[in-house]
Amino acid sequence: MSRLLFVALLAISLGYVASSSSNHLPAGLAMDLGPGVNLNERFFDQVRALIKRRLQEKGLAKPEQPELAMPLTDDDAVALQNQRSYDNVPLPAASVPTPVLVENWPTEQHSFGQVTAVAVDPQGSPVVFHRAERYWDVNTFNESNIYYLIEYGPIKENTIYVLDAKTGAIKSGWGSNMFYMPHGLTIDLHGNYWITDVAMHQAFKFKPFSNKPLLTIGKRFRPGSSVKHLCKPTSIAVATTGEFFIADGYCNSRILKFNAAGKLLRTIPQPPEFLSLQVPHAITLLEHLDLLCIADRENMRVVCPKAGLISSHGEGEPAATIQEPDLGRVFGVASFGDIVFAVNGPTSMLPVRGFTIDPRSETIIGHWGEFKNPHSMAVSVNGSALYVTEIGTNHQTNRVWKYVLA
């Protein structure tokens, strides 16, 4: 009886995966969480393999007979020669920090709207970017990705708040009457704020508390796929060299690399690069490894192509890829040292939680946390704290979590 129940549950689970869509999510979340789960073939191959092993362990399926080795074709040989030379030795367990939740943080509840992003400034203060009363739903954009609600004007409230790292109390705020549909926030080592607005189809660089951008990429309210346009950009990563990367985003599914002055240097992917992205939702840099790690959301993976900061050597090589059956749709990534932290979002019946990833060995080396709709994350400059935001439909579900990295 227990065996039959086990098989039935597996069948139901697979059926649920295939039929899942964002329509099952709460109102106000569906569009931002994506139009549905993209069925990635490699992901489901791994799921099928996992189920087959479980059935074999329980005696419900015969073990497969080993296949005879086939000679390599010329194409196979070329592919092997082009593989990466990453160090596949996993990091020592003692060197991997473990996120530990800080209970009762913040000490006072905030009345944020959807908290789409968090960053940490050079002083160690967490900074949140929220939508106030705005929600992204089916009435926000038309089929050409044009923002429907321009006539309502920008959000009148402060959209950016600087919090106290110890208590979570609001220290200061700004960003009123500037943004229409906030999405991404990054703060560089000089304290500059890098912001994306999906309604405006633009990315900005600001000095703190300034209402005039130092740099603007994209055309205001004009989505497009040319080198001068963006379409619902999601995230920005900034190198110490001043070069920066924009994840562009919901429509174009590409990464754009610029020099410090805003001149386009590179598009990822580009021929002959063998890489396909589907909603790059967040990005983070591991400069010492010369890697740009991407939350490739609808492909249910984290991919880390060469950033090309040290040299152009290695650009276009196959990206390090982390994709396992329990990873699901990846919404946020952040990094410190050799480690990438990630959070997934609602994906069928998979747990929604945090992941610790070693990009060099392309493995998940830890799980932590429990969430409902996480959207963004950031690590403090000194690596002592990790913050995760969630978006929801009320003040209780729109919030920020703090973890210490022990």
Curated annotation (Swiss-Prot):
The keyword Disulfide bond applies. Its EC number is 4.3.2.5. N-glycosylated. It holds the Pfam family NHL. One of its GO terms (cellular component) is extracellular region. It catalyses: a [peptide]-C-terminal (2S)-2-hydroxyglycine = a [peptide]-C-terminal amide + glyoxylate. GO terms for molecular function: metal ion binding; peptidylamidoglycolate lyase activity. Peptidyl-alpha-hydroxylglycine alpha-amidating lyase that catalyzes an essential reaction in C-terminal alpha-amidation of peptides. Mediates the dismutation of the unstable peptidyl(2-hydroxyglycine) intermediate to glyoxylate and the corresponding desglycine peptide amide. C-terminal amidation of peptides such as neuropeptides is essential for full biological activity. This is Peptidyl-alpha-hydroxyglycine alpha-amidating lyase 2. It comes from Drosophila melanogaster. The lineage of its organism: Eukaryota, Metazoa, Ecdysozoa, Arthropoda, Hexapoda. The gene is Pal2.
